[in-house]
Amino acid sequence: MDELTAIHKGLFEGVFEDAGKLRTSNTTREVTNDRARAANPEAFFPAGLIETGAHNIAMELADKRNLHALDRDVFVHAFASIYDELGYLHPFRGGNAMVLRIFGSRLAHDAGWDLDWGSVAREEYRSAKHSAYRGDTSALETMFDAILRPANPTRVFLIAGWNQGPAH
């Protein structure tokens, strides 16, 4: 959770009053004009349990050795699942998608893969996330498979004020 809050604070300090702070109220997916979606809003993880949920995801990642040394197809499947869980966690009032992309990119990089987000259209991303919220991560897997490549060891993720741990 510390890394997610540090990323959020680094990105949104001076933009959001609550930058780096967990949301304190329950929320659903964004307001939409799509009647089918609006008629059945999907709630995110309960606000009072965010830290517990984050701990559970961290334990899952630890059990899976942070997705290190996995073959591509196994990595894509496991990464899509973790990405979905983090999306459902939705720890902040705003800015979750950007935080998730950065955290996910770092997780992938540390596991030996890089993600090229430049080729992902906004609607493709949103559609894949919403399908995953309903239990189908196949669109996320397809998207990640298309943008995944072996890691460039010289790539570094820098965000001012974010303690990134040991140098890569």
Which sequence ranges carry the predicted segments?
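FIC/Doc superfamily catalytic core
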Residues: 1-168
